[in-house]
Amino acid sequence: MTGLSSILASLSLGTSIVYFRGWQKLRVHSGGSIPLWRSICFPCGLLLIWLATNSTLARLDDELLTAHMVQHLLLMSVAPFLILWSRPKMPLLLGLPVGFVRSVVGPLSRTRLAHFISGLWGRLAFCWIVSIGVLIFWHVPFFFTAALNFEFWHLVEHSSFLAAGLLFWSPLVP
């Protein structure tokens, strides 16, 4: 596992811990009305991200076009769908320390930029155009080569694929 991969794995583990802390609080306060299947979708999405970026599949992506395309499908289609299907907003917010939510998340969420971004986030056409744009961008030979030759740009590519997938699915997943 490379340095950047280790950082991503740590972020995924930390996010899972925050999610389950919040999920437990939400489950206690809502009388158990959160379906178990929904809570399982979140770690499954994170696991698929890990499989796409750190498993044998990741080591084969330079050699096999099939492995490369499976990575793209996992990062842009399957993992984001599962993460969003879990409805992670409340569990993640409740899992964070209260002081952090009050002093950082709250003020940031009330900014004009946050309101502007949330307005765009739900517009189907915008989400699809950005998602397609990200995919096209990374297949321009110059950027594709940079992602293959430099670990940092490969991480940026995968992160943008995941972000584009989350954006793509956000107006569609209830």
Regions found by a protein language model. Give the residues of each.
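Alpha-helical membrane segments of multi-pass proteins
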Residues: 1-174
